């Protein structure tokens, strides 16, 4: 065992990154450390040569199946090999001085573009080679006194799985082109659905709106209320808010669609029946355009004013402060009665109208490019049911990626649980985009 292990250590490319004091452990010292019956104490010291090397390796067995399957795709392998060769060629060209200044600038630009991809690809290649050598070593460990070492290797593979998953995910994230709207602010609208009694939908709408408000605070975004129409028993008919910050649309673009709830109502008329009710509410996520992106001609607008509706307030039902905008060319209608000032309500309504017009432009672009994804129900198919909140079973299910979360109350807090689901949706969307790219590549080759 010592002979094989020493050969593997000195051949391993990751050895250069390890401190020399680990390399020159004697065989007897190595055997005493590796066969310690208290591996947790040994791992805490982190002085074991195998542990140090495993920390720089990646397993191929238990990583995320979708990501791993994509990485093993022949078309993706060929694509990455070509990119890596191009990067190596550019690297050699830039070492010469024969190119003129214009060509050199173009080469530098392309070289910088490929550098992150090439770095991740080369790291994966080295890691897989190290794993193959490690697996070969493990096959030779068949003696009884080496059983504990095999168990130790098995434990450390769990850490390795996380690393290879992270590396594959990083590669896919760099390969997928970023949407130009991802960094936009958004206008988020929620609207209660209809069911027997109606109370369950309105209560659920308020909970979902509060969830996204809390999520905005969790992500350190700015949450600006634009419209809020309350219902009886603390429910909510409709609400809209502007959310601004870092990559807001990127994180919220897959939240648009129909959210379904299944629960026994606690308040309202429906609570008298004491049985499970099913209701829905809709979420619309609109990227907020700049002034230059969407221009609205005042001649295309019809402005109606009316008295605000709602509970309480001296301005309610006393002045025509509420505003309704009708965009004549498209037929879009926007109302706002949030502010006491008619002028402010008109500004808010115009902002929402521009966002909806901008959304139509985005949908048109995606249809023309034929790259709309199934996950993008927030922009392509608002009528699709994307998620179910089953209170009786304490479970949240996202139907697009078959993802389940327990503890609904924790999920509705709009913090870590929601953020984890959103990250999974983003990753699945990237994987789907890569799959479409690979399918197109194979068809073009045929």
From Swiss-Prot:
It is found in: Mitochondrion. The modification N5-methylglutamine is found at residue 314. A motif (GGQ) lies at residues 312-314. Its main location: mitochondrion. Disulfide bonds: none annotated. Residues 298-362 are annotated as: GGQ domain. One of its GO terms (biological process) is mitochondrial translational termination. Residues 1-62 form a transit peptide. One of its GO terms (molecular function) is translation release factor activity, codon specific. Methylation of glutamine in the GGQ triplet by HEMK1 is conserved from bacteria to mammals. GO terms for cellular component: mitochondrion. Keywords: Methylation, Mitochondrion, Protein biosynthesis, Transit peptide. The keyword Mitochondrion applies. The keyword Ion transport does not apply. Mitochondrial peptide chain release factor that directs the termination of translation in response to the peptide chain non-canonical stop codons AGG and AGA. Non-canonical termination codons AGG and AGA are found at the end of MT-CO1/COX1 and MT-ND6/ND6 open reading frames, respectively. The GGQ domain interacts with the peptidyltransferase center (PTC) of the large ribosomal subunit to trigger nascent chain hydrolysis. Belongs to the prokaryotic/mitochondrial release factor family. This is Peptide chain release factor 1, mitochondrial. The gene is Mtrf1.
């Amino acid at each position: 065992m010592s002979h094989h292990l020493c050969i593997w250590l000195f051949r391993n490319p990751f050895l250069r990154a390890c401190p020399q004091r680990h390399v020159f452990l004697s065989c007897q010292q190595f055997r005493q450390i590796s066969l310690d019956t208290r591996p947790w104490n040994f791992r805490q010291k982190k002085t074991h040569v195998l542990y140090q090397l495993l920390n720089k390796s990646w397993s191929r067995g238990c990583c995320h199946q979708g990501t791993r399957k994509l990485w093993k795709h022949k078309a993706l392998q060929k694509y990455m090999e070509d990119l890596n060769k191009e990067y190596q060629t550019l690297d050699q060209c830039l070492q010469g001085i024969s190119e003129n200044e214009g060509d050199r600038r173009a080469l530098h630009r392309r070289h910088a573009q490929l550098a992150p991809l090439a770095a991740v690809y080369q790291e994966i290649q080295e890691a897989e080679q190290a794993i193959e050598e490690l697996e070969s070593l493990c096959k030779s460990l068949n003696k009884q006194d080496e059983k504990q070492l095999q168990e130790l290797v098995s434990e450390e593979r769990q850490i390795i799985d996380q690393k290879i998953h992270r590396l594959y995910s990083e590669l896919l994230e760099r390969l997928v082109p970023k949407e130009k709207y991802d960094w936009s602010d958004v206008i988020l609208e929620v609207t209660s659905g209809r069911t027997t009694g109606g109370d369950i939908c309105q209560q659920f709408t308020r909970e979902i709106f509060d969830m996204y408000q809390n999520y905005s605070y969790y992500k350190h975004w700015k949450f600006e209320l634009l419209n809020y129409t309350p219902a009886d028993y603390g429910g909510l008919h409709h609400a809209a808010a502007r959310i601004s910050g870092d990559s807001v649309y990127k994180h919220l673009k897959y939240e648009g669609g129909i959210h379904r709830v299944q629960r026994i109502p606690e308040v309202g008329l429906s609570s008298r029946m004491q049985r499970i009710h099913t209701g829905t509410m809709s979420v619309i996520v609109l990227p907020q355009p700049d002034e230059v992106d969407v221009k609205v001609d005042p001649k295309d607008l019809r402005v109606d004013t009316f008295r605000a509706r709602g509970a309480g307030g001296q301005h309610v039902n006393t002045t025509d402060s509420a505003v309704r905008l009708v965009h004549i060319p498209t037929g879009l209608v926007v109302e706002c009665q949030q502010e006491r000032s008619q002028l402010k309500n008109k500004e808010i309504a115009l902002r929402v109208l521009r966002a909806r017009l901008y959304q139509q432009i985005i949908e048109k672009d995606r249809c023309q490019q034929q790259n709309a994804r199934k996950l993008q129900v927030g922009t392509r198919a608002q009528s699709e049911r994307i998620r179910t909140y089953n209170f009786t079973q304490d479970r949240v299910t996202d139907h697009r990626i078959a993802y389940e979360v327990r503890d609904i109350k924790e999920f509705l807090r709009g913090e870590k649980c929601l953020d984890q689901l959103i990250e999974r949706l983003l990753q699945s969307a990237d994987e789907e985009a890569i799959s479409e790219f690979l399918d197109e590549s194979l068809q073009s080759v045929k």
